[in-house]
Amino acid sequence: TGSRGQYHIHNLKEIPHARIVAVCDNYAPNLQQAVELCPGAKAYTDYRKLLESADIDGVIISTPLNWHAPIVLDALAAGKHVFCEKAMARTLDECKAIYDAYQTTNQVLYFCMQRMYDEKYIKGMQMIHSGLIGDVVGMRCHWFRNADWRRPVPSRLRGKPCKPTA
């Protein structure tokens, strides 16, 4: 439920028949923000517990890449529809495992290309496809923004080494 998850929350809230019944994050500040955005949604810190819930039809996975394959596989095994951020997985073996698992289900599995549904990009593609700007023979793109895409690190954690959990 970090920045990407909250982006999806805002989009889901625009869909009349969509209901956000649960949110999950192991980072408390992000989870709290998501709970505030989704009154009535149950909060989870462990995605496996969320997947056990019978009132959840599908999940949106917007975790760091190393978690995509495990969560997608667990969600498919739990009978959930899956919408996952790109990239599909870290390795070809993980991608194959996801594909093989998907083939055994009747679930929807979709991998999101972040800007594919952004109005600015859609308008640009419409202009290209309509011929309005002529033949495109080259393109250069720069992306400037005034915020860091990574989640903030609380000041109490800055400069401290990570400790193994096991």
Model-identified regions with their sequence ranges:
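Short hydrophobic/charged patches on amphipathic alpha-helices used for structural packing
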Residues: 47-51, 125
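Beta-strand-loop-alpha-helix segment that lines the small-molecule cofactor/substrate pocket
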Residues: 64-65, 69-117, 131
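Predominantly a Rossmann-like dinucleotide-binding segment in NAD(P)-dependent oxidoreductases
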Residues: 107-110, 115-166
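N-terminal Rossmann-like NAD(P) cofactor-binding module of classical short-chain dehydrogenase/reductase
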Residues: 58-60
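Short, solvent-exposed loop/turn and secondary-structure capping segments
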Residues: 7-11, 33-34, 71-73, 94-95, ...
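Glycine-centered tight turns that cap/initiate beta-strands
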Residues: 17, 40, 55, 132-135
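N-terminal Rossmann-like dinucleotide-binding module
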Residues: 1-38, 118, 128
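Conserved SAM-binding strand-loop segment of SAM-dependent methyltransferases
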Residues: 40-47
